[in-house]
């Protein structure tokens, strides 16, 4: 019924926002992102921790990001995001779930938020405008860094692990440093729990119950954060920096969360950062399709780039093209020997040249057909010189079609139908065999004459 449909739509429908609401923070975000770009000319990425409108905010505000929504998004990246506790789906992946570790690995140097965040040695305030704030992540790696070759091939992150556990495995594999995230406590069945931090530090939560879609976090009964749409993702919740004197309350309206609590070990994190940064790719020049820089490797290693793997990327080491491959089926990677090297990355879409050639040929053919048709209609071209197929395509009736009509008009009397009164049982009049044979013979003679003329030509 109409009433039932209306109630269902109200309960399950997807809401929309007004243009005024959608553009409410546009000028403020443009202001803070421009302030950053005016003062920092290096390569960096930035993303919104709180206040994002969509996965494509980076495209909207013209800043580089680790989020995207696209029907052709990289499946390997989406799977990697799932493993390390970041937002992902079939046709999108996003920054929700970023940690200090993934900020560093993915070159996310700046974080945008429409809420004030607690500062720490890891992240501090940079600029703000009209309710939009930018924080600088102080330990961000360049777009590429050297890793052990065995890591590039042998790393295994388990699907049944939460994102924090897999990030611990990842950092241990890349640097040899274990437990960058320190397990604090867990709440297997509680829907409402109170966390007392064991020490001051950056806190992260992992919700294992897949039926929980929304979690509310309140710090010291004053500051409240709500995290939505976590049901379909193996997502990490970034609570921010908390002190050991703080009280953190976590609640869910849908039952037990199976909540795990972790704290970032800053000393281990900084050691891991320094190890990777000591053999990182120093970018000298870059554009949307090209990077130029140097890297010094202490031994034979692999360079891992925080760039989604694509066949369009080519890597040149000391002027020679190197073989590229996909690390974890997601990121661009290339082997490099010990020593200091000039490394150049170039991007050109796969089959771009072939596509341009085919497009150009098609345009030429279409122009040719159009011009030929114009000349024919103007009577400047004799159609007799064209093959029969082309003539038919250009709407010039063949001789056979012409003579069928002519002979039919000459031999079928118009009075035949007039003599018939029963139109409900209309039947074709009988035409004697002699007339039929005459028609067929005439058609064959004309086709033979036409073929002889074309042969002579």
Regions found by a protein language model. Give the residues of each.
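C-terminal, active-site-flanking charged/polar segments
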Residues: 1-4, 123-155, 223-224, 233, ...
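Extracytoplasmic/lumenal acceptor-recognition loop(s) of multi-pass membrane glycoenzymes
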Residues: 2-23, 34-105, 139-165, 173, ...
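Hydrophobic, well-ordered secondary-structure elements that form the walls
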Residues: 46, 62, 111, 315, ...
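Solvent-exposed loop/turn segments at secondary-structure junctions
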Residues: 52-55, 111, 117-118, 330
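Periplasmic/luminal catalytic loop of GT-C fold multi-pass membrane glycosyltransferases
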Residues: 88-132, 138
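Active-site-proximal, structured, solvent-exposed surfaces of multi-pass membrane proteins
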Residues: 176-413, 418-421, 456-457
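Long, low-complexity, intrinsically disordered segments
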Residues: 420-457
């Amino acid at each position: 019924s109409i009433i039932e449909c209306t109630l269902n739509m109200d309960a399950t429908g997807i809401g929309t926002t007004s243009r005024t609401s959608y553009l409410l923070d546009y000028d403020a975000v443009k202001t803070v992102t421009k302030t950053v770009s005016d003062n920092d000319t290096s390569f960096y990425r930035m993303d919104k921790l709180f206040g994002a409108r969509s996965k494509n905010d980076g495209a909207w505000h013209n800043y580089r990001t680790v989020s995207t929504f696209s029907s052709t998004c990289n499946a390997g990246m989406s799977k990697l995001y799932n493993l390390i506790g970041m937002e992902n789906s079939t046709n999108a992946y996003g920054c929700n779930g970023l940690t200090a570790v993934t900020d560093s690995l993915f070159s996310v140097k700046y974080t945008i938020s429409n809420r004030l965040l607690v500062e720490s040695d890891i992240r501090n305030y940079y600029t703000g405008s009209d309710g939009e704030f930018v924080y600088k992540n102080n330990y961000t790696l360049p777009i590429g860094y050297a890793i052990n070759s065995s890591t590039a091939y042998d790393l295994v992150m388990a699907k049944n692990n939460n994102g924090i556990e897999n990030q611990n495995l990842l950092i241990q594999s890349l640097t040899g440093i274990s437990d960058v995230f320190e397990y604090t406590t867990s709440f297997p069945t509680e829907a409402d729990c109170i966390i007392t931090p064991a020490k001051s530090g950056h806190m992260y939560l992992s919700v294992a119950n897949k039926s929980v879609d929304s979690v509310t976090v309140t710090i010291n009964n004053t500051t409240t954060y709500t995290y939505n749409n976590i049901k379909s993702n193996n997502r990490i919740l970034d609570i921010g920096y908390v002190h050991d004197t703080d009280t953190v309350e976590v609640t869910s309206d849908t039952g037990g969360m199976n909540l795990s609590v972790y704290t970032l070990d800053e000393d281990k994190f900084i050691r891991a950062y320094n190890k990777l940064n000591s053999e990182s790719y120093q970018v000298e020049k870059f554009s949307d399709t090209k990077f130029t820089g140097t890297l010094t490797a202490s031994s034979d290693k692999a360079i891992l780039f925080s760039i989604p793997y694509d066949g369009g990327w080519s890597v040149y080491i000391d002027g020679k093209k190197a073989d590229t491959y996909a690390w974890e089926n997601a990121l661009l990677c290339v082997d490099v020997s010990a020593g200091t090297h000039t490394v150049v990355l170039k991007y050109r879409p796969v089959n771009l040249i072939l596509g341009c050639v085919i497009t150009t040929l098609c345009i030429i053919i279409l122009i040719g057909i159009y011009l030929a048709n114009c000349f024919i209609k103007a009577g400047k071209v004799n159609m007799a010189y064209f093959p029969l197929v082309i003539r038919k395509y250009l709407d010039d009736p063949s001789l056979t079609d012409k003579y069928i009509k002519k002979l039919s008009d000459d031999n079928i009397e118009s009075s035949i139908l007039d003599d018939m009164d029963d139109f409900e049982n209309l039947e074709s009049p009988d035409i004697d065999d002699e007339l039929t044979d005459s028609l067929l013979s005439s058609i064959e003679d004309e086709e033979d004459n036409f073929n002889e003329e074309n042969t002579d030509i």
